[in-house]
Amino acid sequence: MAIQRPKGTNDLLPSGSPKTEAFQRAAAHEWLIAQAREVLERAGAQRIDTPMFEEAELVKRGVGGSTDIVRKEMFTVYYFGDHGGYVLRPEGTASIVRAYLENGLKQLPAPLKLWTSGPMFRAERHQKGRYRQFTQVDYEVLGSADALVDAEAIALMVAVVQKLGLRGVRVKLGSIGDPEDRERYNAYLRDLFSPHLGRLSDDSKDRLERNPMRILDSKSASDQELLAELSVRPMLDFLGEGAAADFRQVQAYLSDWGVPFDLDPSIVRGLDYYRRTAWELHYEGIGAKSALGGGGRYDGLSEQLGGGSVPGIGWAFGVERLLLALEQEGIEIPGSGGPQLYVAALDEENVPLAARVALAARASCRAEFAYRAMKPGSAFKDAERRGAVWVGLIGSEEAAAGTLSLKNLHTGEQKTVPVGELGQALA
């Protein structure tokens, strides 16, 4: 039996590969990340990259020991002689904050805007739109607790999606308050759910003690049935004055900028480090779960990792999920494109010359060459299969004259040009 890729992963393939969707094409990933990079760097964000594996303790302390990520979804790495001391990163925020603290980035002007992209890993059941290895774009801002920073982060996430051409998405905006607000809310939830303990799923029975708010985000059918019967008050009813005023300010900024959003008091973030502003970006056509991504404020994360108090906010979206949404909308996703020039020799003795011409042409354009002599018809067919724009033919006459016979496969234009003027002829 032939060896196949691990379940829940994807090979990123060249353009033109058979039976591939956009999220399986390397060029589509590169295009989407480039669009996000342009939006984020115009806003002052700088790129940061962190290792794909981290100490397990970073994830446990940063993401939270009660989360599904830590309890069920971490990939432990056993190859470093420590038998489990490292894990493949399940998300990017904790790693970025760790890098911020470790490398003295607090000395840079605040707020510091950072972005990254790369693979993340979750040991969960794979399905359409959800994978065990997936690509993520992260945007993080460190060093400011201002509501204006929150609003800008949300606006930038919407701007990235709009630049891609995606319509039909909605920002669902909420707040999970400060730690003391959540303590009051969790006490309320324990009182509410405790009489119904026998109807809760095993996971939610555990959550009732650790973090009752996570019950509201349960996918269990029995939990969903119970939630539908109970009249659960929203977290927004428990916000202290500081968190409530901050939430009103975020809404005011978004409204002033014309950023569309819906208030959603049911927003519950899956990671323990979040506080106050929280949101998700949804699109209904991608299956599994409709969230393309989400974000929120995490002012306490730095202290959990052993650093001082550093306020922060950030968001992330999955590249594969966003590409699925673009395909659902019928949006054309650029491929890598073929060469601008394809050079072929008409006889074997001029194959080295054709190669030399193509190598020189690469100074100004994408150029390929045929590795053997070809008849004109075969050269045109081969160039067309590769997506070339121009075909350049070199025979004995062209070699003697120092010229190239060009044909544009898109327009049919034909001309003979000196090799030294090839760059101008293709411009």
From Swiss-Prot:
Entry keyword NAD:
no
- Single GO biological process annotation from the record: histidyl-tRNA aminoacylation
Question: Catalytic activity, per the record?
Answer: tRNA(His) + L-histidine + ATP = L-histidyl-tRNA(His) + AMP + diphosphate + H(+)
Q: Where in the cell is it found?
A: Cytoplasm
**What domain of life is recorded for the organism?**
Bacteria
What EC number(s) does the entry state? 6.1.1.21
Q: What class of enzyme is it?
A: ligase
Write down the Pfam families for this protein, in alphabetical order.
HGTP_anticodon, tRNA-synt_His
Q: What is its main location?
A: cytoplasm
Q: What are the GO cellular component annotations?
A: cytoplasm
Query: Which GO MF terms does the UniProt record name?
Result: ATP binding; histidine-tRNA ligase activity
What keywords tag this UniProt record? Aminoacyl-tRNA synthetase, ATP-binding, Cytoplasm, Ligase, Nucleotide-binding, Protein biosynthesis
Assigned protein family: Belongs to the class-II aminoacyl-tRNA synthetase family.
How this chain assembles, per its entry, is: Homodimer.
Protein name per its UniProtKB record: Histidine--tRNA ligase
Q: Which organism is it from?
A: Deinococcus radiodurans (strain ATCC 13939 / DSM 20539 / JCM 16871 / CCUG 27074 / LMG 4051 / NBRC 15346 / NCIMB 9279 / VKM B-1422 / R1)
